[in-house]
């Protein structure tokens, strides 16, 4: 069972629709009991770091996420804010993140030539190849909307990078844990292939 975690921070319906187009069923839930039965977890999100962590805590989801992801090694895909919440902390807020990836979330500091947020289509380069990036071509294009990005303490966790004045990490990977800065559900064939990889192989 694929569980899309609904904690009030994103358009979960569009992710469910993409998964259906690939040929799989997913549930949208914030019920810890249903999440405990899932074989794949997706943590989407748009909004602020502290609001995301607060909502997860108030819904009683942090303990079940720790059990599923850390103890049971259930594959997890964090999307946009969901990727940020996998880290230890964010410049955007004061609360601690889930800490699944040894990393921090920081705000873009760019020249006037580059607008914040980084919005629109951009290319990714693969730092490593693994199950999530399988059969994706070099310089695949994805859709981004973000003002913050992730800095990994361990460079081995960097899966993809993207150029926006400077190079930044656009996807992370550690064992059963994956995070993408872009929105697969808005990225057409590239997003569908990545989501299919996560569901079938990760």
From Swiss-Prot:
Q: Where is the Glutamine amidotransferase type-1 domain?
A: 1-202
HAMAP family for the chain: HisH (MF_00278)
List the Pfam families hit by this protein, alphabetically.
GATase
Reactions catalysed, as given in the entry: 5-[(5-phospho-1-deoxy-D-ribulos-1-ylimino)methylamino]-1-(5-phospho-beta-D-ribosyl)imidazole-4-carboxamide + L-glutamine = D-erythro-1-(imidazol-4-yl)glycerol 3-phosphate + 5-amino-1-(5-phospho-beta-D-ribosyl)imidazole-4-carboxamide + L-glutamate + H(+); L-glutamine + H2O = L-glutamate + NH4(+)
Active-site residues per Swiss-Prot or TrEMBL entry: 80 (nucleophile), 183, 185
What protein name is recorded for this chain? Imidazole glycerol phosphate synthase subunit HisH 2
A biological process term (GO) from this entry: L-histidine biosynthetic process
Give the UniProt subcellular location, in the record's own words: Cytoplasm
Entry-linked InterPro entries: Class_I_gatase-like, GATASE, Imidazole-glycPsynth_HisH
What EC number(s) is this enzyme filed under? Answer: 4.3.2.10, 3.5.1.2
Single annotated GO MF: lyase activity
How this chain assembles, per its entry, is: Heterodimer of HisH and HisF.
Disulfide linkages recorded for this protein, renumbered to the chain, are none
Could you tell me which Gene3D superfamilies the record lists for this protein? 3.40.50.880
What UniProt keywords are attached to this protein's entry?
Answer: Amino-acid biosynthesis, Cytoplasm, Glutamine amidotransferase, Histidine biosynthesis, Hydrolase, Lyase
Pathways involved: Amino-acid biosynthesis; L-histidine biosynthesis; L-histidine from 5-phospho-alpha-D-ribose 1-diphosphate: step 5/9
A Gene Ontology term for the protein's cellular component = cytoplasm
Q: What does this protein do?
A: IGPS catalyzes the conversion of PRFAR and glutamine to IGP, AICAR and glutamate. The HisH subunit provides the glutamine amidotransferase activity that produces the ammonia necessary to HisF for the synthesis of IGP and AICAR.
